[in-house]
């Protein structure tokens, strides 16, 4: 009997004494049930519909171009026009390159494909309505000039970074805020339950993924209880992020429990421009004075409920105080846009300021400067990338990074390599166990260039690191939802917190240092690859912006 089969039996049946032939049949039945379940799943139906639409579109374009020269000429002119349009857009050069290459390779079909699924050109109605929702909170997000002057007097370098966030994202920097860093999903879950139970007035939650299980079921039970007590409880989840984890129209089931709920950007199985723009944020706001954000979704995977990818490494942060209002604003802006179809309400944003119920919150120590920020694909400002670039380019001693995916453009890659070449201690932590094989392979394709530049690259050997962290010089850090990949930096709704001179900075540093110790450092020898693998890496890097 082969070693692989023996391993298969043991894995499936926990080393029982089942006869090998019977075990093989049982394993086959188990696999068949999984296949049948997948064929009945919403994901399979959606994927099939998209493939059929894509095939029909391609076949139609090819047929028309083959038999009608005028149509062929129109498609070619369209592709040329699209190429010129792409070149003149304010997109990342790598994103432009992959689309221009694709269009030039398939000129008849490429231009049409870009117009349908490429780019980030949202409908005017979509942009206008989101901006209108933002206007409602804008006047309450004005920068306190005294805080700005105090930060500038303390550190002009940090003041410049903060000023960029204020101008690009329209969120001010605050004092009078406590920050508490949580280095795992388990720590976040424990603190989340504690804070939810204390809620007296309202709870706002916004997540990319929710999945039935211990974590979400526990949270849902509390939300239902609080809604029954008369609290304003609102839940928002991304319809694509939760495509495989909750049933179809799950938002309606949640509303039946007395909880206001909407699915962000409801997914329709059609080739569409809006398919790319997902809500990757993770936000919890409780009574205006307390907020959470970070990498964790509401699913058991994030609290190591099951070892799908080995040990799951997570990072979250809690804010208590004035800075919480920025997250309240982010939530209400998005809620206002999508909730109109379910709820008729005129929101008085003053009611949600942290000062309204601050006296009821447990007093905690305030320190330093805290600046939450949001990033939206509906404008031409890549705020999250700007935050990362500012942190990297202004570092003098060290830059410690954790990211589940490292698939970046030339600007961020060059900045990181230049910092290392300038003598800054640059370290990057990525997963050892892949959740998406092709993205993991693309991440590894950057290793050689990084290591040659002097960057110390580590893989988290216990499993999968999902933290999104940057900490610099024992002074400043950012914790949030933003992966170092094209989707997070250019296509998704994201958020994070910039933290300066707060105990959370040291906590992030200590967490990363201890995690580096149990991770494998990548050497130049590890990055060697044969001809075929180098070719694969080249292709992966070329198409990285589409991942």
Regions found by a protein language model. Name each.
Residues 424-484:
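C-terminal structural cap/anchor segments
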Residues 5-385, 390, 394, 434, ...:
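N-terminal localization/anchoring segments of enzymes in phospholipid and broader phosphate metabolism
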């Amino acid at each position: 009997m082969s070693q692989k089969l023996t391993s298969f039996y043991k894995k499936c049946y926990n080393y029982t004494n089942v006869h090998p032939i019977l075990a093989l049949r049982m394993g086959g039945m188990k696999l068949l049930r999984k296949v049948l379940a997948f064929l009945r799943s919403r994901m399979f139906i959606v994927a099939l519909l998209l493939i059929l639409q894509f095939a029909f579109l391609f076949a139609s374009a090819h047929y028309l171009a083959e038999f009608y020269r005028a149509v062929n000429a129109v498609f070619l002119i369209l592709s040329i026009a699209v190429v010129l349009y792409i070149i003149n857009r304010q997109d990342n050069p790598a994103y432009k390159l992959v689309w221009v290459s694709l269009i030039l390779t398939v000129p008849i079909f490429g231009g049409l494909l870009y117009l349908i699924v490429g780019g980030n050109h949202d409908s005017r109605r979509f942009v206008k309505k989101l901006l209108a929702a933002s206007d409602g909170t804008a006047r309450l997000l004005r920068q306190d000039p005294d805080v700005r002057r105090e930060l500038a007097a303390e550190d002009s370098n940090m003041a410049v970074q903060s000023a960029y966030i204020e101008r690009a994202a329209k969120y001010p920097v605050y004092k009078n805020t406590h920050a508490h860093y949580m280095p795992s999903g388990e720590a976040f879950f424990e603190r989340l339950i504690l804070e939810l139970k204390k809620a007296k007035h309202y709870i706002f939650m916004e997540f990319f993924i929710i999945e039935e299980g211990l974590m979400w079921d526990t949270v849902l039970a509390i939300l239902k209880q609080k809604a029954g007590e008369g609290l304003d409880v609102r839940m928002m989840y991304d319809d694509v992020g939760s495509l495989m984890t909750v049933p179809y129209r799950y938002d309606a089931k949640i509303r039946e429990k007395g909880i206001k709920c909407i699915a962000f950007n409801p997914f329709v199985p059609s080739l569409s421009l809006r398919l790319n723009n997902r809500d990757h944020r993770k936000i919890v706001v409780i009574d205006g004075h307390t907020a959470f954000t970070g990498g964790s979704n509401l699913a058991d995977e994030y609290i190591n409920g099951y070892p799908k990818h080995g040990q799951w490494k997570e990072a979250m942060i809690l804010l208590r105080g004035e800075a919480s209002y920025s997250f309240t604003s982010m939530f209400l802006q998005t809620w206002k846009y999508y909730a109109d179809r379910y709820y008729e309400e005129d929101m008085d944003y003053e009611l949600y300021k942290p000062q309204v119920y601050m006296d009821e919150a447990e007093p905690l120590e305030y320190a330093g400067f805290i600046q939450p920020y949001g990033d939206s694909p509906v404008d031409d400002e890549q705020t999250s990338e700007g935050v990362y670039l500012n942190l990297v380019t202004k570092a003098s001693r060290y830059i410690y990074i954790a990211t589940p995916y490292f698939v970046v453009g030339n600007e961020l890659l060059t900045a990181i390599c230049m910092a290392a070449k300038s003598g800054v201690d640059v370290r990057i932590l990525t997963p050892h166990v892949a959740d998406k094989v092709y993205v993991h392979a693309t991440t590894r394709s950057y290793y050689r260039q990084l290591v040659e530049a002097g960057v110390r690259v580590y893989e988290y050997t216990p499993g999968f690191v999902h933290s999104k962290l940057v900490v610099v010089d024992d002074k400043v850090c950012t914790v949030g939802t933003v992966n170092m990949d094209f989707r997070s930096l250019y296509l998704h709704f994201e958020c994070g917190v910039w933290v300066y001179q707060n105990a959370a900075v040291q906590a992030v540093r200590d967490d990363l240092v201890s995690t580096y110790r149990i991770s494998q450092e990548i050497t130049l020898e590890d990055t060697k690859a044969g001809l075929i693998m180098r070719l694969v890496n080249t292709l992966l890097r070329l198409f990285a912006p589409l991942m």
